[in-house]
Design a protein with these regions (language model features):
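Structural motif
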Residues: 70, 80, 198-201
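Residue-level signature of transmembrane alpha-helical entry/exit and packing/kink sites
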Residues: 10-19, 45-56, 86-91, 128-132, ...
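Transmembrane helix-loop-helix hairpins at the membrane interface
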Residues: 28, 110-112, 117-228
Length: 228
């Protein structure tokens, strides 16, 4: 059942379900952050990060519920399908290319402006390997549903423009991550976000984006901190 509230110029009705889904996907993480759940239930860095990971999975579950039981649509409508070999290759290739460009841009900025590495990266480097793996798995999967698959597809339907969906995803993703990563972290994050949005616009497949994000996060979270 659809609860229509208004009508976009593209002729697609905006339902309450889609509105709720967009709020959950795009802004659910920072809204939960305002509740300080991690700090309330844990006094350690490891505990806080694991609680944050659980929160991200809960948001994805909520979005899935909206799609399947409120919108009554398949998860394929937000890009959850097995990728073709070409789509998988695009995902992996974009991850490698994004890494090279992101680290190059960061290196130039650090050298030019004497910037320091983000505190978040130093904090992650001190965690145990199992916790790092949990953080990587959470990030590469949940963030692609929340900031790529759902919002890009639904905003494209509402506006009639795939580019508006992609641009919104890019801007919100950067804004949400900026407080944790700061200026120096925002440089590679911008490159990575462009790569991830580009992969989704090209493939319309969230699994391809997960492959891109996996390549990036494995290097940035598991490999790079060991050399810093």
């Amino acid at each position: 059942m659809s609860f229509d509230t208004t009508q976009s110029q593209s002729g697609v009705s905006v339902s309450l379900a889609v509105f709720v889904g967009l709020v959950l996907a795009l802004f659910g993480s920072p809204l939960l952050g305002q509740l300080d759940i991690a700090d309330r239930f844990s006094t350690t860095t490891t505990g806080s990060m694991l609680i944050n990971s659980v929160s991200m999975w809960a948001l994805v579950a909520a979005v899935f519920v909206v799609v399947r039981f409120w919108e009554r649509r398949p998860l394929g409508s937000i890009g959850l399908e097995m990728p073709t070999r070409r789509q998988a290759a695009v995902g992996v290739g974009a991850g490698l290319g994004g890494l090279v460009l992101g680290m190059l841009a960061t290196g130039i900025a650090v050298a030019a402006f004497s910037l320091e590495q983000p505190e978040t990266l130093s904090t992650i480097a001190e965690l145990s390997l199992p916790v790092k793996l949990a953080i990587v798995a959470t990030g590469v999967i949940t963030e692609e549903f929340l900031w790529r698959g759902y919002p890009i597809e639904r905003l494209t339907e509402l506006t009639g423009s795939l580019w508006i969906g992609g641009a919104t995803s890019f801007i919100v993703f950067l804004a949400v991550h900026f407080p944790a990563w700061g200026i120096v972290g925002a440089i590679p994050q911008a490159v990575f976000a462009l790569a991830l949005v580009g992969v989704y616009l090209r493939t319309r497949n969230v699994v391809a984006c997960i492959l891109t994000h996996t390549v990036i996060n494995v290097v940035m979270v598991l490999v790079l901190p060991a050399f810093l």
